[in-house]
Amino acid sequence: QRQMCIRDSTNRIERNMKRVAAYLGIPEEKLHIDIRWTMLMVNVSDEKHSFSKFQKCEKHGINMEAISKISKLSWRAIEQDYSLDKYEEELEKIARQERNYTPYVVAICTGFACGGFCKLFGGDWIAFLITAICTFVGFRTRARCIEFGINVYMSIAISAFLCTCLAYAFSFSGLSSTPYHPLLACTLYIVPGVPLINFVDDMIDNHLLVGITRAANTVMMVGGMAFGIAFALRLLVMSDVTIDQKFSELSMVPHDAYWVYAVAAAIAAMGFATIFNVQRRLLWVVAVGGIIAVCTRNFVNFELGYGPVIGSFMGSFVVSLIAVKAVHWFHVPNHVLTIPSVIPMVPGVLMYRSLLALINMRGVVGEVTLAFSNGINSALIIFCIALGVAVPNIFARRYIAKDRQRFLTQMLAERRARGKFIEW
């Protein structure tokens, strides 16, 4: 239940539950698990007895450190012969543990992360700072709205609206030579990267119900963001020809050196890592992952000419492939390293072009085609990013699973020899 609340993948939840069942001496064939988005159902039964437990999960929040610690705890409990009380005590410690970063530190880092997006989209360093300010205000606004009990999706819409209004106001300041780029980047902290990647992971692993629910949750979050942005654009009368042309004229081709994009990608990746509560010791690893992802994407896209969709897939694929080995170096789950690293590849320019095209429709021939072309391209890029992360991890699990099962069997045999094993 704790893993579902911190948005772990369904496959990992199932593996950990089976490992804990083995620690308790429950044979796998007598354990029946059904995982849903808001409900976890477990049944243990034999020919004479049947025990069922339903556990509800209402609040969902990303916590990468907790994901890592829960996984390690299930192994440690077997190795060190934990009593049930000791295991429960350790689990409660993980649940009560303070996050690595205070709310205001996370808000500041999120601001810099979206500033990194702005730089990746071609903005200057003043636009970077403007984006960081707008994002900081929007991020804290969303947090306050949720604290006051406002609906999550409405909180997202309010924060997106406020971010867009602030970025629009800054466009008149004359401080930046790229005044419209902050509008593209200031709300991208809302894009639900973790649910999206877990959705692809679940669908490939045949956890269809949870996968579809995650997809619906992702659509609702993006819908809330789009509503807030669209309302701001209408309220601020930003449907005029000049603004529309400015967004359509924004170049998708990099104009800066690769090292500039590497710095921006590292900042964005580390910023999102603080949102996901990644351990401090891993921030530099995530930064390197972000650099590899963005530079690979740009090389495949522009140097080899395969386009942004294939480029984004290859960027996330390479990072995920490296992470398959790196998880053994840093002793953390794959997603702790991969998800923050690939977030800087989110296609903000295409998303905005699609949204603006839909808002500014006046019945002219070709408007629908333009809107859907940008929308489909941005959706394909996001899907390929998620697919690139999921595929190497899924195939690696097939090979690692046998070794892991062999190791688990050996540990259980040693525990039985010590007289600590509970026979069912």
Segment roles from a protein language model:
Residues 116-117, 121, 137-145, 162, ...:
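Alpha-helical membrane-inserting segments
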Residues 2-5:
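Short, small-residue-biased leader/transition segments that mark boundaries at the very start
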Residues 118-134, 179-192, 247-264, 305-317, ...:
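Structural signature of hydrophobic alpha-helical transmembrane segments
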Residues 173-179, 237-253, 358-373:
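Membrane-interface helix termini and inter-helical loops of multi-pass transporters
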Residues 85-98, 112-123, 139-150, 239-253, ...:
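Short juxtamembrane and helix-loop transition motifs at transmembrane-helix boundaries
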Residues 10-35:
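Divalent-cation
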Residues 182-186, 198-202, 206-223, 256-258, ...:
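C-terminal transmembrane helix-loop-helix hairpin of multi-pass membrane proteins
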Residues 99-198, 275-276, 280-285:
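Core alpha-helical transmembrane segments of integral membrane proteins
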